[in-house]
UniProtKB/Swiss-Prot annotation:
GO cellular component: chloroplast; small ribosomal subunit
Protein name: Small ribosomal subunit protein uS7c
Organism, as annotated: Bowenia serrulata (Byfield fern)
NCBIfam families from the UniProt entry: rpsG_bact
Function of the protein: One of the primary rRNA binding proteins, it binds directly to 16S rRNA where it nucleates assembly of the head domain of the 30S subunit.
Pfam families to which the protein is assigned, alphabetical: Ribosomal_S7
Family statement: Belongs to the universal ribosomal protein uS7 family.
Swiss-Prot/TrEMBL keywords: Chloroplast, Plastid, Ribonucleoprotein, Ribosomal protein, RNA-binding, rRNA-binding
Gene3D superfamilies noted in UniProt: Ribosomal protein S7 domain
Residue spans crossing the bilayer: none
Molecular function in Gene Ontology: rRNA binding; structural constituent of ribosome
Length: 156
């Protein structure tokens, strides 16, 4: 056993405009090559697009989308006696939120080319808030995998 104490988790800081941690987590995942101002610009344009299309508070649409994509369980590969089993494990809320953000951004990046990232992200978030879209499909796939491998839950 290590004698070193575990490091305390840092709470995510909130962004300057919406004063929301979730927005900042999203910006940090959009971020590429250290261009944070570009990441902020992409997200704020996406939020403005959501505001125009839905005429709702974009922050509530974002929260609803992330809540819809957040998985409860996932599978983890576990090697037991020479064979690998997909073992279902429960996910903590912070980890689930991080997965939801990653899946939403991945789904929006995979949308057909021709439009900018802000446009793709806004449409992916609006779809996720309406319970459809590729990110929601990914969550359902993870839940299906966990359900199919429920017999191996005791390998946890």
């Amino acid at each position: 056993m290590s004698r070193r104490s575990t490091a305390e988790k840092e709470t995510a800081k909130s962004d300057p405009i919406y004063r929301n941690r979730l927005v900042n987590m999203l910006v940090n995942r959009i971020l590429r090559h250290g261009k944070k101002s570009l990441a902020y610009r992409i997200l704020y344009r996406a939020m403005k697009n959501i505001q125009q299309k839905t005429e709702k508070n974009p922050l509530s649409v974002l929260r609803q989308a992330i809540r819809g994509v957040t998985p409860n369980v996932t599978v983890k590969a576990r090697r037991v006696g020479g064979s690998t089993y997909q073992v279902p494990i429960e996910i903590r809320s912070t980890q689930g939120k991080a997965l939801a953000i990653r899946w939403s951004l991945g789904a929006s990046r995979k949308r057909p080319p021709g439009r900018n990232m802000a446009f793709k992200l806004s449409y992916e978030l609006m779809d996720a808030a309406r319970e459809n879209g590729n990110a929601i499909r990914k969550k359902e796939e993870a839940h299906r995998m966990a359900e199919a491998n429920r017999a191996f839950a005791h390998f946890r």
